Curated annotation (Swiss-Prot):
GO terms for molecular function: structural constituent of eye lens. This is Gamma-crystallin M1-2. Has a two-domain beta-structure, folded into four very similar Greek key motifs. Transmembrane segments: none annotated. It comes from Aquarana catesbeiana (American bullfrog). Belongs to the beta/gamma-crystallin family. Monomer. It comes from the Eukaryota. Crystallins are the dominant structural components of the vertebrate eye lens. Keywords: Eye lens protein, Repeat. The keyword Disulfide bond does not apply.
């Protein structure tokens, strides 16, 4: 079972709210969030209610100055616990240079710290997650905006929540939850 604690002040001070399940609307529980402690599991937190807006992946650990380390201006508005069995088994991802799974395709079984080095493009317009869960990052070396991809077909970049096709890196969510 997962457990995440949101604190109103930095360094785990002030009023706190503990959560062990998905929560589509955190706003009634605290006024601000300046630090987070993940005691169990892996979580995606979202900048807007109902799992909308920018996403941020948090694994077990402490985030004493949450807004600074995540580059956020606002408190998280919703949170989702990722499965404890996430990433067990194989991981397979196909990426495409054009929408609707068209154009040049590459298949990945491992993390990719720099998409351009492997795919010769900064853009992925569609993809198919065949096995496992993956996180796309806007910038190389696992930085920038994050997008969680579950198994399934993503016909265009908007399907995974992005406003652009720019993907700088991606990694498997494996063995860390």
């Amino acid at each position: 079972m997962g457990k995440i604690i949101f604190y109103e002040d930095r360094n785990f001070q002030g009023r706190s709210y503990e959560c062990s399940n998905d929560n589509p609307d955190l706003q009634p529980n605290f006024n601000a969030c300046n630090s987070v402690r993940v005691e169990n599991g892996c979580w995606m937190i979202y900048e807007r209610p109902n799992y909308m807006g920018h996403q941020y992946f948090l694994k077990r650990g402490e985030y004493p100055d949450y807004q600074q380390c995540q580059g956020l201006n606002d408190s998280p508005q919703s949170s989702r616990l990722l499965s404890q069995n996430l990433g067990i088994g194989t991981n397979k991802l196909r990426v495409y240079e054009r929408g609707d799974s068209k154009g040049e395709m590459m298949e990945f079984l491992e993390d990719c710290p720099n998409v351009y080095d492997r795919f010769c493009s900064h853009e992925i317009h569609s993809c198919n997650v065949l096995d496992g869960y993956w996180i796309f990052y806007e910038l190389p070396n696992y930085k920038g905006k994050q997008y969680l991809l579950r198994p399934g077909e993503y016909k265009r970049f908007t399907d995974w929540g992005s406003q652009t096709a720019k993907v700088g890196s991606f990694r498997r969510v494996i063995g860390i939850c």
